[in-house]
Amino acid sequence: MEPSQCVEELEDDVFQPEDGEPVTQPGSLLSADLFAQSLLDCPLSRLQLFPLTHCCGPGLRPTSQEDKATQTLSPASPSQGVMLPCGVTEEPQRLFYGNAGYRLPLPASFPAVLPIGEQPPEGQWQHQAEVQIARKLQCIADQFHRLHVQQHQQNQNRVWWQILLFLHNLALNGEENRNGAGPR
């Protein structure tokens, strides 16, 4: 299978509209075509070290749309349901609030929608490649952070199990410990 076919067959639930969300037009900045890249668009497309996950939502979106896959509720509302990734038991400390995490500055000359069939100037291809690289780097950072948090929680769980096992053995073998059962 050629790499271009792999990229075309890549499906991700990030780019699928949810119920009630507006569907974007094929030429708009929010369409999935912006994220699908051929080998000519970006030479780094062969180097997909990490698969796209639902942490990698589109970075360019109106403020009316929200990325439900990466939302966490603020610490001020613990009584409501907390949306956390699988395996995470503690709510992470938020680095960004609102849309600050996925707003990217665009130059004033950047058109909102290109006419169908028209190629953007060379400088805009570079800008698009930079935006895509930034998104992939953000994905890698999110995955690293998620793995770090999971590893930290697993280490904490191991410590608690070791303490529990020690107390269990101490309670069951208390008589032997008190009588001074010598070295074996």
From Swiss-Prot:
Q: Name one GO cellular component term.
A: mitochondrial outer membrane
Renumbered residue ranges of the record's region Interaction with DLC2: 67-75
Name used for this protein in its record: Bcl-2-modifying factor
The similarity annotation says: Belongs to the Bcl-2 family.
| Summary of the function given for this chain in its UniProt record | May play a role in apoptosis. Isoform 1 seems to be the main initiator.
| Subunit architecture | Interacts with MCL1, BCL2, BCL2L1/BCL-Xl, BCL2A1 and BCL2L2/BCL-w. Interacts with the myosin V actin motor complex through its binding to DLC2.
User: As annotated in Swiss-Prot or TrEMBL, what is the tissue specificity of this protein?
Assistant: Isoform 1 is mainly expressed in B-lymphoid cells. Isoform 2 and isoform 3 are mainly expressed in B-CLL and normal B-cells.
| Keyword annotations from UniProtKB, A to Z | Apoptosis
Return one Gene Ontology term, BP aspect. Answer: negative regulation of autophagy
Annotated source species: Homo sapiens (Human)
- Disulphides: none
Q: Which parts of the sequence form the motif BH3?
A: 133-147
Report the domain of life of the source organism: Eukaryota
Q: Name one Pfam family in it.
A: BMF
Q: Which residues form the signal peptide?
A: none
